[in-house]
């Protein structure tokens, strides 16, 4: 990857519940980011997205020029024309070119991304599941996330979000991989970014409980047998005591 380039970040509107007295002291029940768009000279590339409570509501696929809903519920009562996003990206590109000409082109500081891999639900062998690769602290928003299975590149069954914005102006991105857990397979999430000296591999493999050894099984069976025999002996003793204590009372009652 080449060194970092200039990027422009435009955000139109933040909000949910605002008052006329300033927003810094307000605790809102819900927060939405509308019209978050980024364009950068590397590529060139960019993205446009709407977010709600930290989740991506939808993004616009700039290549296909269509709106892609990540929260389908919202698409039932609203729509978004992707042409609006394309106009915003074009404006950002124009402004970026002006800023480049007027600046000294000082490269932004490349942050080191933080990578975590975990399953969506508890792992059970043979039961379909999803692996999640959560990449945080991304800046600038140029990154490549791929999956490896047993050391080989995975070519299908995965998807990812666009860049999600954070309050500190860094970004996060999440990649999903559907898989069938097996004790013979292991996975790696491979992350490439300008903040890394070399690609980062985050390893994951299912944690399968180790089978009991033959000695352990023998001990467990022996303990179970002993407990069973003790139970039989104790039960027999109680029955005999009960018969002895009940004998005289039955004899006296017949007189």
Curated annotation (Swiss-Prot):
Q: Hey, what's the signal peptide range on this chain? A: 1-23
Query: GO terms for biological process?
Result: adaptive immune response; antigen processing and presentation of exogenous peptide antigen via MHC class II; peptide antigen assembly with MHC class II protein complex; positive regulation of immune response; positive regulation of T cell activation
Q: Which cysteines are joined by disulfide bonds?
A: 133-189
Organism field = Sus scrofa
**Which Pfam families does the record associate with it?**
C1-set, MHC_II_alpha
| Topology in membrane | Single-pass type I membrane protein
The name this protein goes by in its record: SLA class II histocompatibility antigen, DQ haplotype D alpha chain
Q: Where is this region: Connecting peptide?
A: 205-217
Q: Where is this region: Alpha-2?
A: 121-204
Segments carrying the region annotation (Alpha-1) are 24-120
């Amino acid at each position: 990857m080449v060194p970092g380039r200039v990027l422009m970040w435009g955000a139109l509107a933040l909000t949910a519940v605002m008052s006329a007295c300033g927003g810094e002291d307000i605790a809102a029940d819900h927060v939405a980011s509308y019209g978050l768009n980024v364009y950068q000279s590397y590529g060139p590339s960019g993205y446009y997205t709407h977010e709600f409570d930290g989740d991506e509501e939808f993004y616009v696929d700039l290549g296909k020029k269509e709106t892609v809903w990540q929260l389908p519920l919202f698409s039932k009562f609203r729509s978004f024309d992707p042409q609006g996003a394309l106009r915003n990206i074009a404006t950002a590109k124009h402004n970026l070119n002006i800023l480049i000409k007027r600046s000294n082109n000082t490269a932004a500081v490349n942050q080191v991304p933080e990578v975590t891999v975990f399953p969506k639900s508890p792992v059970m062998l043979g039961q379909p599941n999803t692996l999640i690769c959560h990449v945080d602290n991304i800046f600038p928003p140029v990154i490549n996330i791929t999956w490896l299975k047993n050391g080989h590149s995975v070519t299908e069954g995965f998807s990812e979000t666009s860049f999600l914005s954070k309050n500190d102006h860094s970004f996060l991105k999440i990649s999903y991989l559907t898989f069938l857990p097996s004790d013979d397979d292991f996975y790696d999430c491979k992350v490439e970014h300008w903040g890394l000296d070399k690609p980062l591999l985050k390893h994951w493999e299912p944690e399968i409980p180790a089978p009991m050894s033959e000695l352990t099984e023998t001990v467990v069976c022996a303990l179970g047998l002993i407990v069973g025999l003790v139970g039989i002996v104790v039960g027999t003793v109680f029955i005999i005591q009960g018969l002895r204590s009940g004998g005289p009372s039955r004899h006296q009652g017949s007189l």
